């Protein structure tokens, strides 16, 4: 995934999903001996190991293949499905360019490392645009009424303007966690620009 805010969003989404599905849990696992942080999704007798890799910049995309090979497939001899979470930087949903150049190299590396499946979670918007699908919830968190218009071209600028309107500052990454935890993820699933049902289907729960 592209950045730390995406990691906060997806981990919060999985916690929400577990909370709203009986018999499911999503918990952080700390392995202090090797400095590894992972997560585990449990549903009945089934457990799924979840690991996040934050790329940071597009130029680091190809390094994700080596990360997957070394920290996932070689270390844990289990079937792995890889979800590529990214912004298309385009108003349409054409993802053909994400099968070319560095992205093709990444996909080849993942296949070489025996990824069972590669799933695209592509959004024609940045992560703040996705979160702003629940603008009512964000405004409630900020203690303000919903504005008639949001200033800014992209989601990040809009989010910053929304926070400034009440004298607050929007911070990305872990500092956004308190706000993200309050989001209406059902609304985002239903109306958002990312097909989160792909993730739900993979961990074998029925979205409500």
At which residue positions do the language-model features occur?
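C-terminal accessory helical subdomains adjacent to catalytic cores in phosphodiester-
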Residues: 7-208
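Short hydrophobic beta-strand that contains or immediately precedes a catalytic carboxylate
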Residues: 1-2
């Amino acid at each position: 995934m592209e950045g730390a805010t995406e990691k906060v969003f997806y981990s919060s989404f999985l916690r929400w999903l577990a909370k709203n599905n009986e018999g499911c849990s999503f918990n952080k696992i700390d392995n202090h001996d090797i400095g590894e942080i992972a997560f585990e999704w449990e549903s009945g007798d089934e457990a799924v190991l979840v690991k996040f890799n934050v790329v940071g910049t597009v130029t680091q995309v190809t390094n994700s293949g080596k990360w997957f090979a070394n920290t996932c497939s070689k270390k844990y001899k289990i079937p792995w499905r890889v979800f590529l979470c990214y912004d298309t930087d385009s108003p349409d949903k054409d993802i053909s360019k994400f099968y070319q150049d560095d992205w093709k190299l990444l996909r080849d590396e993942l296949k070489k490392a025996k990824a069972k499946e590669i799933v695209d979670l592509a959004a024609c918007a940045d992560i703040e645009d996705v979160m702003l699908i629940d603008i009512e919830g964000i405004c409630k968190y900020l203690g303000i009424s919903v504005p008639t218009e949001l200033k800014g071209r992209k989601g990040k600028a809009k989010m910053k303007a929304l926070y400034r309107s009440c004298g607050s500052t929007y911070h990305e990454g872990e500092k956004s966690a308190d706000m993200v935890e309050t989001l209406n993820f059902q609304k985002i699933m239903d109306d958002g620009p990312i097909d989160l049902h792909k993730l739900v289907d993979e961990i074998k729960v029925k979205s409500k």
